[in-house]
Amino acid sequence: MAQHIGFYMDNIICVHWGTKYPVKFVNILYSMCKRNMTRPFNFYCLTDEPNNAFAERVKPIRIPDPQFDGWWNKMHLYDKRLEIEGNILYMDLDVVVINELDEFFTQYRDEDFLCIRDFGQPTTTINSSVLRYNLKHHSFIYDDYMNNKSLYDGMHGDQNVITDMMLRHEKTQILPDDWTYSFKWPERGQPQKYEKYLPKKHPLKKKAKICVFHGHPNPDYAMQYESGEWVKNYWK
């Protein structure tokens, strides 16, 4: 579990389970965050294998209930047993951090649940690749999920559950669209097939904070092509 400290630092967290992503994805995410945070922060990894070869400053937290499958492990992000104090920025492992992340912590209230609009259709749903929350205010998400697990497990995944619970919640704030964008679908609401898109030149959106690589391709694959050549300068 997380260590208690005398004041609330900013926190960044990711989730790593199974073999879908090598451990280097965790370490690269930490490295990108380190370059793009001017404020002190803790970096946590919620994982089924806390003894993995994580970078020195990565603080592993064992997933409390390892019987969860796949993306349902992400519901543990809201589990008060993590004992993380202060605001928490969650990012999927397949993102590329482009610019400073401080505003996730400085521009909103602690009680605000911050999320981004989805990239495909409809854009009115929540994309769970990037979220900011606080266990003091949002651990009810985990409690509600556990109390209605059979109902929620019938949904497609955690993203649908978060949309159902939080889209109309009074403290939910949708982050500015220009903070995040999709590598595959750079304009929200205009999805393309990646195999048609990948060979094209893909200009970097230099004012964005995070580029999301949902589905295929991942950053390490995309940067082999002209359309993702810029990724080499950031995903490291």
Regions found by a protein language model. Name each.
Residues 30-35:
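Surface-exposed amphipathic alpha-helices with a cationic face
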Residues 47-49:
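Glycosyltransferase specificity loop/lid
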Residues 37-41, 84:
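Short, solvent-exposed loop/edge-beta patches enriched in aromatic
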Residues 124-126, 223-224:
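Short glycine/proline-enriched turns and hinge-like loops at secondary-structure junctions
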Residues 5-28, 39, 45, 54-62, ...:
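A glycosyltransferase accessory/donor-loop signature
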Residues 51-55, 60-62, 66-67, 72-125, ...:
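GT-A fold catalytic core of metal-dependent nucleotide-sugar glycosyltransferases
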Residues 126-127, 207:
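A generic structural signal for well-ordered coil/turn residues at beta-strand boundaries
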